[in-house]
Amino acid sequence: MTQFLISIMDITPLSDSLSGDKALYDKAFKLVPGYRQQKICNLKNDAAKCRCLAAGLLLNYTTRTFISGSVSGFITGSLADNTPTVKNIPFPVTVSAAVCTYAQEYDYETACIANGKPYFKEHENLHFNLSHSGNFAVCIVAGMPCGIDIEGNRPFKPSVAKRFFSKTEYHWIYDTENVSVQAERFFRLWTLKEAYAKATGNGIAAEIHAASYVPDTDSDGLCFADSEIGKHFQIKEAEHNGLRIAAVLSDSAF
């Protein structure tokens, strides 16, 4: 079994279906477990409904694929691989593929810890996390605690960076006058902070200042400024369709 798998899904077909003939949307909805169906029904916004449904499809597909070990050459591997950036990640999953291959035996029962992090109730050695931004949802399934985040570059206020980032991180953002590069760096850091907080399960409010990041001298990625944290956590970064993706994996249980 590979130790982790990250996948991504463009949810546009679900959105198009919901606003059109609803055939694909309705077919997908009937597949996901009852708790997710109820969650979807409680959402008032169509975009939110599609994201929630896509998360269920993607989690089922990624869990099955991870357990079967049927994916190679994408973001699969172990903590022994210390490369922070991998160019051929994440593994793309279409809505139609997830619907056609849906296997309900992989709909493991989930619950949430006090801070809202989800987990599989009866599979303590199997971990997962989900995130979404715009028309994309991402999922990580791993054999260790993990967190994932996806964000799109957008305008941000310097005051936000100054408030939430370390001095080193702040100076790294602004050591260029290129506004686009500044935004890219800001959201690289932000996705890492979100992913780290989700990996620990403590939430972003508790972890925003707990770990800071610096450029990795051996690659074009980022690494933990505190080498002690870096001994127990590993970073994986990617870019997909202009979106930043960060995953943090741990060799420790929380």
Regions found by a protein language model. Give the residues of each.
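Core catalytic alpha/beta fold that binds nucleotide/phospho-ligands
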Residues: 1-254
